[in-house]
Amino acid sequence: MAESPSEEKYQVTLDNWRKYPYTYWSFVNVRNLIPTAGIETNLNSKTNFKKNITNLQDLKVIHQDIRYNFINVLKNCHTDAFLVMHKGVLIYEYFDKFTLKDSPHIIFSISKSLTSLLTGILFQEKKIDLNKTVSNIIPETKGTAYEDAKIRNVLDMNVASKFIEDYTGEAEIFKKYRSSTGWDLPDNNLKNNFDGLHDFLSNMPRSKLSHGQKYHYCSPNSDLLGWIIERVSQEKYYKLM
C-alpha cells in the first residue's frame, strides 16, 4: 500500500476494504476508496483537554486466570486507537499502524446517533414534524415501505419493511444496498441493481406488518433520515452537521 501501485496482494479494493488486514489502512483512508464529504470542525468550539498522561505499559489484564500485558491486548485485538479520559482529563492515548492523532477514522453506525441528534435539533427548531409521513417530505418514496411510515417510525427503527440486515452478505437486498451506497461493487449475478442510494430507498419493499408493530434494525432508515434532513433544511447533510 506504500508503493505505487502496491503489489496485488497488498492492494485495498471495494472487495476487501472491510476485511483484515486491509482494515488497518482502509479505515483511515475511506476517502480514497468511496465518495465522501468532509465535515468542517468549528475551531471556536474546540476543546483542549487537560492532560495527565499515565504510563499503562505495566498494566495487566486478567482473562481466565491468565495475566496479559495491556499493550499486548490492544495489539492482539488489532486496535487502531484507544483513549482513556477520567473526569475530563486525558490520561492515556494509543495509536497503531496507520492511525495518527488527526486521522479521520471511519465510525460506522455511530453516524446513526449523530443523524438522530441532528433530526432532534431540527425538531426543536420546528423545522421537522415527526408525525408527518415520509412521503409527505420525500414523494419519491410513494409505493414503498416508507410511504405511510411516520418520521418517528424511521427514528424508532420500526418501519415495516422487508429489508434484511445481513452482515454475512448473503441476502440479496443487503447486497444491493451495499452496492447502492458505493461500499461494494455491484453483484453482476443479481438483476435490477440500483442506481445509487436514493434509487434504493425509493424502492424499499413493504412487509405485511404494521409500522410500529415490531422493532426492526435497518441501516437504510438512517440513510433516509439524512435525505429527509436535506429536504426539510435545503442544506447538504454534511454542512448541517
Which positions does each model-derived feature cover?
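N-terminal leader/targeting segments and the immediately adjacent pre-domain N-terminus
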Residues: 1-99, 128, 156, 160-162
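Soluble non-cytosolic domains of exported or imported proteins
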Residues: 64, 79, 105, 109, ...
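Non-transmembrane alpha-helical segments in soluble domains
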Residues: 71-74, 120, 135, 152-156, ...
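N-terminal core-entry segment
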Residues: 84-89, 95, 152-156, 167-171, ...
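Active-site SXXK
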Residues: 88, 106-130, 154, 225-229
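Short linear capping/connector segments at secondary-structure termini
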Residues: 96, 101-103, 133-140, 172-173
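Catalytic-site signature segments of enzymes, centered on catalytic residues
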Residues: 101-102, 167-169, 178-241
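Active-site helix/loop module of the DD-peptidase/beta-lactamase fold
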Residues: 106, 124-167, 206, 233-241
